[in-house]
Amino acid sequence: MNVLVTGCSRGVGLEICRVLLEQGNTVYGVARSYTDEFKALEAEYAGKLFFKSIDLSDSESIRKSVFKEFVGNKVVLDVYVNNAAMAYDDIVTNLNLDRLKAMYAVNVFTPMMITKYALRNMLLHHTKGCIIHISSISAHTGYKGLAMYASSKGALEAFSKNTAREWGGLGIRSNVVVPGFMETAMSSTLSEEQKERIYKRTSLKAATSVRSVAETVVFLLSDSACSITGQNIHVDNGTV
């Protein structure tokens, strides 16, 4: 399968690429940073993993930067995995509109635009494709300072649910993976005390496995998940 993955250069996105490649897929990775970790994976899977550096905050340029210059119509796109995200940690009384708009551009508007053109590619090639969005447990449980970020993930979940309903008749599926707290670059600013408080809210009292999240994504795009669509799949160590 041909798979487009955003936010591919580190953390969950990189692990998703790794699992996809291990199973023989071809991966088109999009991110802002071309990291050493991604380059190493690219060298290991030469000819199966491709990269393009793109500013995902520029929602209006997505058609040109992704679907004309990278994944053209000659590529039969089977899967789009939306993993890229921007954090915004602050309390509501400090809400800044410019920061909010910048986050929504990356977390909501650009994924919507990529979904639009991914669907057009699938329709052009009569592909029974699959769309998977990576959400956050913060959209389902309250955390101080995450109201704005959580709202963007909630919007994404609603978008996925309705996309699934809209295009299911043509065999196109859309699902969301909802990870719990993971040890990634996005969470690296938290203190050990803050992390421990989060762990205590889970049934397994630990951070969510990045590998487990990646393998759930790959399961959802497989034939084994052919009857799963419009769902939010929690991989959160029993937080919810």
Residue spans for each PLM region:
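Conserved glycine-rich cofactor-binding loop
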Residues: 9-10
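Catalytic Tyr-X3-Lys loop
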Residues: 86, 93-113, 132, 156
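Conserved mid-core segment of classical short-chain dehydrogenase/reductases
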Residues: 87-101, 120, 145-148, 186-191
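Active-site helix of classical SDR
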Residues: 115, 152, 160
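Alpha-helical segment proximal to the catalytic Tyr-Lys
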Residues: 120, 124, 165-169, 226
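Residue(s) in the substrate-gating loop at a strand-loop-helix junction
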Residues: 136
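Active-site-adjacent segment of SDR/Rossmann-fold oxidoreductases
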Residues: 141, 162-172
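C-terminal substrate-recognition "lid" of short-chain dehydrogenase/reductases
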Residues: 206-235
